[in-house]
Amino acid sequence: EGEDLTLEEKAEICSELELQQKYVDIASNIIGDLSSLPMVGKIVGTIAAAAMTVTHVASGRLDIEQTLLGCSDLPFDQIKEILEKRFNEIDRKLESHSAALEEITKLVEKSISAVEKTRKQMNKRFDEVMKSIQDAKVSPIVSKINNFARYFDTEKERIRGLKLNDYILKLEEPNGILLHFKESRTPKDDSLQAPLFSIIQERYAVPKSIDDELAFKVLXALLYGTQTYVSVMFFLLEQYSFLANHYYEKGDLEKYDEYFNSLNNVFLDFKSSLVGTGTSNNEGLLDRVLQVLMIVKNSEFLKLGKNGVDEMLNSKINLFNKIKEEIEGKQRMTLSETPENFAQISFDKDITTPIGDWRDGREVRYAVQYASETLFSKIGHWSDPVNVRERACPTLRMPVDQTRRNVLVFRKFDNSKPQLVGEITPYLSNFIDIDRDLYNAASNPDSAVGFKEFTKLNYDGANIRATFDQGRTVFHAAAKSGNDKIMFGLTFLAKSTELNQPDKKGYTPIHVAADSGNAGIVNLLIQRGVSINSKTFHFLQTPLHLAAQRGFVTTFQRLMESPEININERDKDGFTPLHYAVRGGERILEAFMNQIDIDINAKSDKGLTPFHLAIIKNDWPVASTLLRSKKVDINAVDENNMTALHYAAILGYLEIAKQLINLKEINANIVSSPGLLSALHYAILYKHDDVASFLLRSSNVNVNLKALGGITPLHLAVIQGRKHILSLMFXIGVNIEQQTDEKYTPLHLAAMSKYPELIQIFLNQGSNFEAKTNSGATPLHLATFKGKSQAALILLNNEVNWRDTDENGQMPIHGAAMTGLLDVAQAIISLDATVLDIEDKNSDTPLNLAAQNFHIDAVKYFIDQGADINTRNKKGHAPLLAFSKKGNLDMVKYLFDKNANVYIADNDGMNFFYYAVRNGHLNIVKYAMSEKDKFEWSNIDNNRRDECPKEECAISHFAVCDAVQFDKIEIVKYFVGTLGNFGICGPLHQAARYGHLHIVKYLVEEEFLSVDGSKTDTPLCYASENGHLAVVQYLVSNGAKVNHDCDNGMTAIDKAITKNHLQVVQFLAANGVDFRRKNSRGATPFLTAVAENAFDIAEYLIREKRQDININEQNVDKDTALHLAVYYKNLQMIKLLVKYGIDVTIRNAYDKTALDIATDAKFSIIVEYLKTKSGKFRREYKSSYGEPSLLQTNKISSFIDGKNIEHDHLQFINADNESSQLFSDTVSNIDVIGTLLLVDVLIRYFSKQGYISKESDSASDGITQAAALSITEKFEDVLNSLHNESVKEQVDLAEVHGRVYAALKSGRNSRIHQILCSSLKSISTLKPEDMEELVSVIMNSQSSVSLPEVTDSANEAYGEA
């Protein structure tokens, strides 16, 4: 139950259970932490595994359940194997890339990361998708995708951890994986391209509805397959790039060219397949998949409401567009032209042989390569050989490249390894081959020969600044070879900046000298004033770090002679040179400890000291050396509060543990954080019995120490099944009834564990088998509810109480039923048959729990024993309902045969037949219809009477309605086509209502139902009201009457208008709607739009259908559209109507103009607007000479400074409960910011008076308009209270109202306070006397408007949330 699981399998189980310590960290996060390992350089797998697993386990609570499941049982061998594979991979990648491949490598690694991240997430669930696809056409296609993806992942992982030579052999196998993956883009039957294009062409991945599970599963397969396809391309690019680089480093330029060429061909081939060739008839795979995604995204059924599908589609569209853009942006991987070798070779220099590689009788050849920005060509053919005779360092004459590219020059003697010897820049034609020889001379380990050759070449003009391998110069070369004569000469020739010149990895010459142990060179460079503490680029290592890890004592001493040296300098991860010296050995450590300024307990970023590292390294001599300083803190803790003893316990280092325990200052009971685990806890957790036994016997170890959750070492010993440790604990008298915080005893844990034999051991020790946890569970409860059959039977054989109930009123029999432990259930029933029908607090019986969890054998056993087959729990769930919902026809038949009540229903009125219909189980539906002696669908069903209030409806009515509503077309076809039930539930009307176009088409085209139906409301009415444009279009195109009456004397366009479906209105308007026709309310479509506050529709009708409407028309009460807009306080609509010339003087049946109505109702903003008829308030500024301007200065007051809210509205907004006295005390120093903040408070204060109540879940547009107007009017009240006309005249209240309305309507309610604040931005600061009045209005104003809620989220705007 965990012992045989792989690391990945266990990670999957534990992460799915959503346990606090997600085990998947071990397989992924640990690997991701390699850059911060507590050692430097290559680390053996054991140390890496230990350090990383410690960090991850110690960082979270040791949860009992996860530990029992093995989620904290760390398999070191597997982790070491993973780490070793990753180290091999890193080693390969650390090989230097040729310049030609660096950019390609960056592109590939970046793209792989983006694609593989989401592909791995999909991979976890793809097996489930495969298992659930039963469709005969689709299943084989999806299987091909699955098979290929599995093969790809398996092979990729298999080669990942190979050693270098094995890796090369595997990649170069004839007809091997590279060839197979290259063919994945061909139409071959076993390729990946074939099934992907098949899915696209057959439209298998385009769902017909939100419930089209098959199509959505195929869509997941298409996306998964496409991402795999892209991954294959990048994998191939990565491998060919690696092979090319490998052979470049080996000097095999023919092989380099071969793989360099393959690299480009793979890219171009896959690019053609993925993004096409740019012609209209050759679309790439990505374009086709994006088209499918857009079709699904624009489906009508996805517009009905928010769901996760839309989010998923958007993320995939973004991903594939990004990939497409990346691929399209790269025209090719290499320059297409292979350079011709036009070099003319002449020996013009007076440099005689032998010198360097120039020896008489050897043959020398040259080859060139073009370089243009980030693109490189293949390396051209080698020139004809030239025999070396007495002369060296020839001049190469080449024609100037017309395209102004750089030319890299390579040289090869005989069959030796080629070398890059230089670069010819544009416009130059002559190249003297001398600089590489100077570099080689500086690199010569024979210092005398090297110095002689260097002197000669330097005299003849060689460039000491030329760069070669990894950007290194002769300075680096001399530093590495240790040629102090050359370096001495160079120090006089070079500038100080050149002595500090870093290579591509940041290594300066002194880094190289220190890393090579060349103390003399180090000393020379220090004397010349180089930067002693300079750092490498990635790891930020100083020369001292490098000398320390190599153990070079003399080099260390020379470095320490510099007064500038920082002995405690930290690298990228916070490690000091002393940390590195742990790897260098005892002598270098002693040298460090003799230094006065050394910080012997220095901590890395993770809190690790050198002593920690010595223990992790299992190196007691090094640890002893540190201890001799008498300054080591042996109890120092890292970031997880882990001491050196913790690490020894985790890694199982018994001898180290003994040494540590014997130290006088040791504290063996320090606990980790936040897990609170001691060294003893860890030794048991990691199953190091020898270390655990030693610690248990140690007098200074607390054997009863509690970790987080109250877990003691005894609990862990049970969880991990450590029998030897348990025996030792019993012998030393450990209390066997220890309880965790949740009151788990060791026996509880044994009952849940994978070691049931421990139960008898504890029972023999007298353990209390009736002990209860906080939830009231006994050991028997836990054994049954955790599915531990053997444990439960052992407890039952010891005559434990099987009738105990837990906090849910459940007995062990309920647990056995829930987990399907048939043998345990049989044992309990044989002891006590009265528990057969016993109910828990949810009224669930064992039978019902077994049924709800689909344990068929247990269900049949309980029924055979006489259990109530019609048992129902508090929600009405019953066995028959469970199996029908699941689609288990055999069990439905079984329950029918056992005379189950076939009409039994749950609290929602749902019986087995409805569940079968809603879940698309046609086989169960057909079976039920065939059992007429037991089930009759014509029976009246009052369980769902609220859905059929006007009459009593039969099961058939609800069943047909459900089939249509839940888009189960096969069941619809059965009910309507096979059984001929055309009239039940009005299937065409229902299909139109819910927007199921394919069902509408079926009923019209195959069953020949009339598109106008047989009811008052036509299908077109339903589709229009619910905004199903595609259905509306189909019905009209098939002859539906657009002016046919709906209920209430309305037509289809009226229905669409009432729900503000503009697109439907536009379509109907273009297809013969009678705009003069009035409904039962005497309103035309135009008046209906105004009355319903459908602004967009009203604007459309006025702008686009002006010839069909009369803007001044009146209803039965002689009201015009303007009257109606005033009634609803819709200022936005009023502005629209006035703008397009409505007659504002028309009077209604009560002799009132629109202005009269606004005046009577005291709608001041509307009154002001209608009076001007211009829709604009006065904006000209009129200064008030008689009284001081209310808002003039713009100083930042002490009030704002004191409150620290100068630019922070939110902090002030949330201070709703401050009293008016607070405002009075502070108004004397308030300014512009304060004014705006007070407006924020104003809005929140008003809103709490209930502008929008919580009486309903939605509101009409008119309600929204009213709420917006009420807010604006209160805002106006505040401005009026200021007694300053200039303030009011500068604020356009009509504009404010429109913006507030728009914010409410769009759901952006949080913007309302910003709108009102911005309206005051042009106004200066409030004066104290006026602020008093403003505060008074804010505090005393009461809302007089109580309106229904606009939306649930509208509360946010008013401070109710």
Curated annotation (Swiss-Prot):
- Region Helix H8 is the probable transmembrane region of the tetrameric pore inserted in the target cell membrane, annotated ranges: 218-237
Which is a Pfam family this sequence falls into? Ank
Q: Which keywords accompany this UniProt record? A: ANK repeat, Cleavage on pair of basic residues, Disulfide bond, Exocytosis, Membrane, Neurotoxin, Presynaptic neurotoxin, Repeat, Secreted, Target cell membrane, Target membrane, Toxin, Transmembrane
Read off the InterPro entries from this record: Ankyrin_rpt, Ankyrin_rpt-contain_sf
Q: Which GO BP terms apply?
A: exocytosis
Primary location recorded for the protein, binned into one broad class:
secreted
Modification after translation is described as: Processed by furin-like proteases at both the N- and C-termini.
Q: Where in the chain are disulfide-linked cysteines found? A: C393-C1046
- Where is it localised? Secreted; Target cell membrane
Region (Furin-like endopeptidase recognition region), start-end ranges: 1176-1179
Taxonomically, the superkingdom here is Eukaryota
Q: Reply yes or no: does the keyword Secreted apply.
A: yes
The UniProt entry, under PROSITE patterns, shows:
ANK_REP_REGION (PS50297), ANK_REPEAT (PS50088)
Residue ranges of ANK repeats: 470-501, 505-534, 539-569, 573-602, 606-636, 640-670, 675-703, 709-738, 742-771, 775-804, 808-838, 842-871, 875-904, 908-937, 951-983, 984-1013, 1015-1044, 1048-1077, 1081-1111, 1117-1146
Single GO cellular component annotation? Answer: host cell presynaptic membrane
In which tissues or organs does this protein occur? Answer: Expressed in venom gland, cephalothorax, and abdomen tissues from both males and females.
Q: Which Gene3D superfamilies match?
A: 1.20.5.300, Ankyrin repeat-containing domain
| Extra information | Is the main neurotoxin responsible for the human envenomation syndrome known as latrodectism that results from bites by Latrodectus species.
Functional summary from the UniProt entry = Presynaptic neurotoxin that causes massive release of neurotransmitters from vertebrate (but not invertebrate) nerve terminals and endocrine cells via a complex mechanism involving activation of receptor(s) and toxin insertion into the plasma membrane with subsequent pore formation. Binds to neurexin-1-alpha (NRXN1) in a calcium dependent manner, adhesion G protein-coupled receptor L1 (ADGRL1, also termed latrophilin-1 and calcium-independent receptor of latrotoxin (CIRL)), and receptor-type tyrosine-protein phosphatase S (PTPRS), also termed PTP sigma.
Domain characteristics, as noted in the entry: The H8 helix is predicted to insert into membranes and form pores by assembling into tetramers. The helix is contained within a helical bundle domain that undergoes significant conformational changes during pore formation to allow exposure of the H8 transmembrane helix and transition of the toxin from a soluble monomer to a transmembrane tetramer.
Provide the protein name: Alpha-latrotoxin-Lp1a
Q: Which organism is it from?
A: Latrodectus pallidus
